[in-house]
Amino acid sequence: MSNIFKNNLLKILIILLTISSSGYALKKEDIKTQMENKIDKVLLVLKDKSLSKEEMKKEVITIVDDTFDFDLMAKIALGKDAWNGIDEAKQKEFSEVFEDKIKKSYSDKLELYNDQKVKILTLEPYNNTRLQLKTELIGKEGNYSINYNFYEKNGEWFIYDIDLVGVSIIQTYRQQFAGLLKEKSFDEMFKQFKNQ
C-alpha cells in the first residue's frame, strides 16, 4: 500500500465513527436523513477548536455505537471456521476487543481531520437482502468514495461493513486474521492482536 494511499485512507477513516445514531438503529426510510444528521453533528465536533483532543474523541465516541453491529463485524472479520472453533466466552471477549480496537484506532485519527465534507449520494439494494449507502468524502486532496453496508435485523438496519475507496474494512481484517491463523493458534493470534 503506497504512502499516499495510507495517508488518504487515514483521513477517510475519521468519518467511520461519525455515522452512528445515538440510542437506536435505523429504519430503512430514515437511513439517509439520519446518517446526514449524524455526519453533520460529528463534523461540527471536529471543527470545534475549543475541544482538546481527548474531549473531541470522547464526544465522537459518545455519538457512536448502536448503528454498528460490532459483534457481527467481529464474527465476519474472524471468519466462520475460526469463530465456530472458539467457545462463547472467547467469542464475547474477541468481539469486545475488536470493538475497542476499531473505536480507538479511528478516534486516534481525528486529529487528521482537515475540513473534509461528506456528501450523501444514494441508498441502493446490495447483495439482495442488504443496503448500501454511497457517500463521498470531499477534501482538498481529492474525493473518495465511502460506502456503508447495512443488514436488517428485526426491522432495523445496522452497519456491518464499510468500503473505503473499494476496500472492505472487514475483509481487510479477515485477511489479516486468516494469515495469522495459518501460523498461530487462536489464542496466540488473539494475544498478538490485543497487544497491537
What are these regions (language model features)?
Residues 161-196:
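Low-complexity, intrinsically disordered terminal/linker segments enriched in charged
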Residues 145-171:
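Short beta-strand edge/turn micro-motifs at domain boundaries
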Residues 11-20:
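Bacterial N-terminal signal peptides
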Residues 98, 124, 137-139, 150-152, ...:
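A mature extracytoplasmic/lumenal domain signature
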Residues 23-27:
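Boundary at the C-terminal end of the N-terminal hydrophobic targeting segment
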Residues 2-12:
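Bacterial N-terminal signal peptides that target proteins for export
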Residues 28-109:
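Early exported N-terminus immediately downstream of N-terminal targeting peptides
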Residues 104-144, 196:
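Surface-exposed, charged secondary-structure patches
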